[in-house]
């Protein structure tokens, strides 16, 4: 160790002296003595590393309290930080999918603050069933005989297969052997459930006779999987759910369906593309239908299964059901969301997912044009700002081909350097409320479809 290094080490303050500084007293009040002391020890270690490697004091040496404050604030930030989603993907899986309705937020808050009748029957003063209230609602909305709730749709598919067809064959069209995010594949789920996959048809064409010919003494289920995250076009043929249900009745084989996104309303009435609805499949005679809670339905993450009472009873009594069951917060949010569907006239106003999906291109463009001048005053020296037409997508594997006309604020660097776009996007990600856009075709695009809180957005962008 050189004499210069020893001199620099000697200038480092003692923890006890720092703790009695007035600035650190306020930090101790806010974050606690233990956390502040632990931080100061790490800061001293960092300072020694700087001295050892550079023979200089750290650049924050003159204001230990300010550096400590910044580090404590960063450490205190939640891992789940609110962001402003201007990616153009409404149901963005990486950003949490569906925003919850105010009614759902209030229901979750109430469920967290007090004991609730999760599994308590007020009438009989005994044990109740946690799915009961939601099952009643879901039956009313879909026309099913009963319903079951688990923590996501992948779990719902696993439970359906394990409880009703373990040790048996499940017949599925080859064109419906989907893979969704995280390498979740239908064949893999079947193996986990103890089922044997029996593929029929080809990738692009499957006929009713293929299902009939596949049925044997070991067939447990006929299964339909909605290909919600891709589309096969051209020379194609599929067997619709109603026809497959008729085959199932003829051969006395239950038919189950994985709808994936699962919309409870006819989206075409809002000018959106049609998606199959659980109530249509139930009316067609499908025995069990599963779908997600946090996609087109607009609620919390959940797997919902509706269908025949006897088969739902099999699911409820299976050991996996307890492992996959939903908690009280999920059930509270889902119940509040489902109740919105009982008042369909107000649904597009109260349900954030539907509200964002149904925004008109004209209103989005008007919003972008209104904000353009103020943003140009802040960023115009480096970037050309334009309002351009763009196409939003629904996201989360819902309606993969269809796009929604929208409008975006675009930022193009005057010098044409792509690195400026990367730097700008990175800067926005460090904001107190990060702004997330996308870089494409030499521009940074902010699709305004999902922008509802303009004041917060402008506060961030003008920092």
Swiss-Prot record:
List the GO terms this entry assigns under cellular component, sorted alphabetically. cytoplasm
Gene3D superfamilies registered for this protein in UniProt: 3.90.1150.180, Type I PLP-dependent aspartate aminotransferase-like (Major domain)
User: What pathway does the UniProt record associate with this protein?
Assistant: Aminoacyl-tRNA biosynthesis; selenocysteinyl-tRNA(Sec) biosynthesis; selenocysteinyl-tRNA(Sec) from L-seryl-tRNA(Sec) (bacterial route): step 1/1
Entry GO MF terms: L-seryl-tRNA(Sec) selenium transferase activity
Listed EC numbers: 2.9.1.1
The chemistry this enzyme catalyses reads:
L-seryl-tRNA(Sec) + selenophosphate + H(+) = L-selenocysteinyl-tRNA(Sec) + phosphate
- For the modification N6-(pyridoxal phosphate)lysine, the affected residues are 295
Tell me the enzyme class: transferase
Q: Does the keyword Cytoplasm apply?
A: yes
Q: List the Pfam families hit by this protein, alphabetically.
A: Se-cys_synth_N, SelA
Q: Where in the cell is it found?
A: Cytoplasm
Q: Which InterPro entries match?
A: PyrdxlP-dep_Trfase, PyrdxlP-dep_Trfase_major, SelA-like, SelA_trans, SelA_trans_N_dom
Q: Which GO terms describe its biological process?
A: conversion of seryl-tRNAsec to selenocys-tRNAsec; selenocysteine incorporation
Report which superkingdom the organism of origin falls in: Bacteria
Q: Which residues form a coiled coil?
A: none
| Alphabetically ordered keywords of this record | Cytoplasm, Protein biosynthesis, Pyridoxal phosphate, Selenium, Transferase
Q: SUPFAM superfamilies under this entry?
A: PLP-dependent transferases
Principal subcellular localisation of the protein: cytoplasm
Q: Which cofactor does it need?
A: pyridoxal 5'-phosphate
For this chain, the family text in UniProt reads:
Belongs to the SelA family.
Can you state the subunit structure given in the record? Homodecamer; pentamer of dimers. Binds only one seryl-tRNA(Sec) per dimer.
Reported function: Converts seryl-tRNA(Sec) to selenocysteinyl-tRNA(Sec) required for selenoprotein biosynthesis.
Q: Which HAMAP family match?
A: SelA (MF_00423)
Protein name, entry field: L-seryl-tRNA(Sec) selenium transferase
- Origin organism of this chain? Salmonella newport (strain SL254)
What is the gene called?
A: selA
